[in-house]
């Protein structure tokens, strides 16, 4: 870990900060929810944090380069010295590996895929808003408590501040399913989803093996 920082402050004035922290060729350790599960580790090439005072407040930038985790950055300007605490900026992450989340979800047997996210940040520090796109490719999900194994999961979401559209597809066995819908969290959260599929494999050996068609709508 390398870094440097300069800071100054005076009565009646906002603090002035100029700091940078960089770490290279490190290892992240992830502990599982279940203590019996194996703890995983992942290497990263470089991670850095930069904080610098500007006329409008403070800029924060985070960069990550990690082939086994993902690459990307977040660059945000925030003014923490006024009541509203406004913020704006941008974020972009590419090839984020979903498997890094598996230790934090107890019911997941397998979780894989590549997640990409890019967009603009606005709003305030307490109520941030995001406008952007999210895409999942080559996903694979299997749950311990559910008799389905989802493969070739492809999911696209367009996020507009307080709502998001969802379009996706996946395989279960040789069957194909499509998922569409919207999620709105402006006031009370509302989820509207439609799942349609044919020849989907439902299997939990040795109890269940079945091929099903489905057309389900959810409005909650």
Can you name each region flagged by the protein language model?
Residues 1-215:
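Interface amphipathic segments
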């Amino acid at each position: 870990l390398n870094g440097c920082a300069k800071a100054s402050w005076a009565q009646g004035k906002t603090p002035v900060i100029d700091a940078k922290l960089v770490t290279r060729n490190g290892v992240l350790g992830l502990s599982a929810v279940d203590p019996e599960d194996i703890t995983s580790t992942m290497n990263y090439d470089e991670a850095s944090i930069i904080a610098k005072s500007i006329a409008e407040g403070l800029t924060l930038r985070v960069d990550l380069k990690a082939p086994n985790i993902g690459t990307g950055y977040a660059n945000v300007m925030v003014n923490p010295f006024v009541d509203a605490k406004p913020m704006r900026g941008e974020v972009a992450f590419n090839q984020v590996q979903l498997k890094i989340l598996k230790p934090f979800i107890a019911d997941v047997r397998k979780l894989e895929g590549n997640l990409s996210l890019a967009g603009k940040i606005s709003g305030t520090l307490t109520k941030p808003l995001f406008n952007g796109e999210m895409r999942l490719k080559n996903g694979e999900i299997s749950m311990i408590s559910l008799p389905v194994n989802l493969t070739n999961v492809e999911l696209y979401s367009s996020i507009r501040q307080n709502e998001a559209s969802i379009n996706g597809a996946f395989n279960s066995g040789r069957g194909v399913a499509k998922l569409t819908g919207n999620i709105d969290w402006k006031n009370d959260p509302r989820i509207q989803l439609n799942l349609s599929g044919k020849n989907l494999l439902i299997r939990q050996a040795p109890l269940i093996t079945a091929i099903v068609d489905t057309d389900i709508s959810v409005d909650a």
